């Protein structure tokens, strides 16, 4: 391949160092710039605290993203497209600029990092290569979080395991792979993965990565002419930074993340140290998932570039030195790189034949050497010219070494790593022992894979147990809190028990005092019992007097209840009549609530209140009657005006009808005159035709007479006479025709005018007819309304008369009730006076206690009377306010109902919007899931082949290659 460059079989890891500028917090803290850059052309050394470090390249803080990419990563693009594996990862402490170096700002041509630039470069190189090459590119994106591999393209895959393929190359089993055909597809995958990556805020970095991310680009290419297949993997790794808890202030989950990050980075450092030592036979790749994934990149088949990112601040001097030491050790690690070529059956066969021929030649040479060796062992001295020259043997055995070396480089390089690892053991171990050891290693690796699976299952089981333990701890914490609550409650109860004991003691003392007092009181009670017996005798006497008064009072109550019933019946009848009158006067309005059944059990105050309401209703009906009378007078006036307008309309209608009849007669006469003119026209036309016939006859006679010479003169005379007659006839005919035409034009003009007038009259007639019908309809409506008003007025007049009679009746009944009340009060006062006199005539009018009781009862009666009157007044006021309050309540209820309806509609609308939004979200998710499933998942994926020398190629069903894409070729991005 022309774009290939020569790469040695053994290649050192390339280490570049990049320093970021001081940030704001470091400048505010007063940190100094402790790094020094010696002035050399190559820019490959750095000095800190007097110690110099050498790297492949050192970038100062002002180095641009483009410069970093060109120096550190651009060369790997051609290696990957040539079939080699490549790895680029950034190493350093937290907030040292690793993510900025690897990703940067995607889409910004100045600030974008290595990953977007290398993606654009890969596609640009593909589009510029030979046309007969076809590429298939797929990408994976996952992170190592809390020492668990989590797929960033499918968040449901949270604990993936690492396995090895048939060539012992580690890979992440079950990771999502997406086929891509353009840089835009790759950027979409990157953005999707970035949105799922774990980040957090620490004291040193607002966007601190909490996991190691691995972005894998797998490029497979096929030469369509010779079916040669190459494959290359490019690992783009963004490591999480090492942290010091004292500086980052991590706690809780962030602290656990920091522990796992430091643990995996420590394992990475151990692997680098073991590889740099060169004498260790065991490399601890399996100590961490990170080193297990990067096994091929560290001492394996890959071209690796490490970007160590450092801080120049004195605050981070110790971490910077540690990072520089890591880079210096990594620079000594050697990788064995080879082309990942998939040979065809013919190629394997050809190589087999060559190796077979080579083996046969070598066997012949070995036999010669064995013969010579046997002669030497037999004591025979072999002459110099008979001795076999080893240099000639090697040259003869490998006549085409240069050609074969290029063809067998892949097979030899694939075994180079194993030869290096087994170099110290190959001298003492036989071939059979090596085979046994290889089988044993295979078995041990298989056991390790099984153990990985078991560890994965055990980790999941441990997660479940951890959740159960957390639940149990929560239950224990709740039980502990309840126990503490019960302890405090028990302490409180004990305190209450102690206080209760003290109270019991006090109560016992009080009981003793009460016992003493009881004896004293019992004596006093005996004395009082004697006094009570005497008072009981007096009470019996007073009770008899009270019973007599109670009997009389009951009789008075019966009379009063009888009077109340009579008053109630009268008011019931009165209110019923008032209700009927109100319905007659204002049937559409709400009348007073007259529930007669409710008046039966009411008292006098209720009757007075209802009577007050009746008087108010009567005054209201009077006002309504006056309003109705006024409206009736207005309606009568309007009816008179309407009758006048109707008569005027009828008069105008008669005149218009007369005009219409006149115009119709005139039109008939005009039509007759037109018919006469038409007849005259026809007569004149007939005369013209007859004259033309005579003229033709005369011409024929003239022609006949031309032969006769004798009649020539006569013919001339006749001809002259005939010409003169014809001229006269022609003139007369012309005059008549012109007169007839003028007359026809005048008649036609007159007819047009008559038609216009007739049309206007027809329109006016139709308008008048419509107005007449409308007036008639309004008159009918007014007449019906007037009849209704007259009937209503008559009913109201009758109701007014009935109301006047009812008012007289009510006044008489009220006067009667007033008189009865006066008589009842007088009788009651007389009876009370008699009782008072009788009581005073007894012994001193009773005891002092009874007098006090009577005065107390009288005061209570007066107070109750006042309260009752006040309640009656308040009740009347409330009855007046009740309609207004009911109206306001109805308005409020209507408003509440309207608001409830609006709220319900708003909730329904919100629910509909929410359902629609949820439906759209589910639909989008389903579409995205289907899109993702179309590109990944357990089912077969349709590859997106990319043909070199042009843009992305369209594909048919089943992944077959179609014609070239009409899309324009992607322009190279300035990297």
Swiss-Prot record:
Binding-site list for ATP: 92-99
Coiled coil: 335-931
Region of interest: Necessary for associating with milt: 810-891
Keywords: ATP-binding, Coiled coil, Cytoplasm, Cytoskeleton, Microtubule, Motor protein, Nucleotide-binding
GO molecular function, one term: ATP hydrolysis activity
Globular: region residues: 932-975
Region described as Microtubule-binding: 180-321
Kinesin motor domain boundaries: 12-333
GO cellular component: actin cap; axon cytoplasm; cytoplasm; dendrite cytoplasm; kinesin complex; microtubule; microtubule plus-end
GO biological process: actin filament bundle organization; anterograde axonal transport of mitochondrion; anterograde dendritic transport; anterograde dendritic transport of neurotransmitter receptor complex; axo-dendritic transport; axon guidance; axonogenesis; centrosome separation
Pfam families: Kinesin
UniProt-annotated location(s): Cytoplasm, Cytoskeleton
Acetylation among keywords: no
Chief location: cytoplasm
Gene deletion effect: Flies display impaired action potential propagation and neurotransmitter release at neuromuscular junctions, but are still capable of transporting certain membranes, including synaptic vesicles, to the nerve terminal.
InterPro entries, per the entry: Kinesin-like_fam, Kinesin_motor_CS, Kinesin_motor_dom, Kinesin_motor_dom_sf, P-loop_NTPase
Subunit note: Oligomer composed of two heavy chains and two light chains.
Task of the protein: Kinesin is a microtubule-associated force-producing protein that may play a role in organelle transport. Milt and Miro form an essential protein complex that links Khc to mitochondria for light chain-independent, anterograde transport of mitochondria.
Domain remark from Swiss-Prot or TrEMBL: Composed of three structural domains: a large globular N-terminal domain which is responsible for the motor activity of kinesin (it hydrolyzes ATP and binds microtubule), a central alpha-helical coiled coil domain that mediates the heavy chain dimerization; and a small globular C-terminal domain which interacts with other proteins (such as the kinesin light chains), vesicles and membranous organelles.
Similarity annotation: Belongs to the TRAFAC class myosin-kinesin ATPase superfamily. Kinesin family. Kinesin subfamily.
Stated name of the protein: Kinesin heavy chain
Natural source organism: Drosophila melanogaster (Fruit fly)
Gene behind the chain: Khc
